[in-house]
Amino acid sequence: MALLEVTGISKNFGSTHVLQNISLNLEKGEALAIIGSSGSGKTTLLRCLNFLETPDTGVIRVDGKTLWDAADPATHRESEVRKKRLHFGLVFQNFNLFPQYTALQNITLAGELLAKEKPEYKANRKAIHAELEEKARTLLAQMGLSERENHYPHQLSGGQQQRVAIARALALEPDILCFDEPTSALDPE
């Protein structure tokens, strides 16, 4: 069974057909590159996979579980969108780092927000925060950015910002990691 199964995804914006009957399978550990000209729908496909856009047709499954089926309204519940998004990590083309937060804070923020939704958060807030920071520091080290944890995005190069965005996406331990324009700011190291 494929880790990711996309079947018949279509997306229209008014009379513009951006995605037409897109299907793909991705096995665990496999990498897939989607190459196309500007405006060909690559970003729209990623946005549909992450439920930032709603596909008009088709089915999205992760590890055999149906996350979206255009023909099944039960998969359209807004209350389930956040849970569905946790299957995917997305590194945006422009990284979308929060300018008012340090590299470390950018990585821990999503984990903090998720933790706050749990009933045990108030009693264990300090321990949870410490655990999230430790994980973020480990990811920064893996990205070669340990010395940049207290730097703000404007103090980082484009490649460094991208690596912080990758660390942020990895922090939530997604099943699938998606990159929009992954080579746009890589340092030539």
Predicted regions and their residues:
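Helix-to-loop junction immediately C-terminal to a conserved catalytic motif
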Residues: 50
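Catalytic Walker B motif of ABC-type/P-loop ATPase nucleotide-binding domains
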Residues: 177-180
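Conserved ABC ATPase signature
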Residues: 152-156, 160
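Helix N-cap at the start of a conserved alpha-helix in ABC-type nucleotide-binding domains
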Residues: 188-189
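ABC ATPase NBD coupling module
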Residues: 67-89, 127-130
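A short, proline-enriched helix->beta-strand linker immediately N-terminal to the Walker B motif
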Residues: 171-175
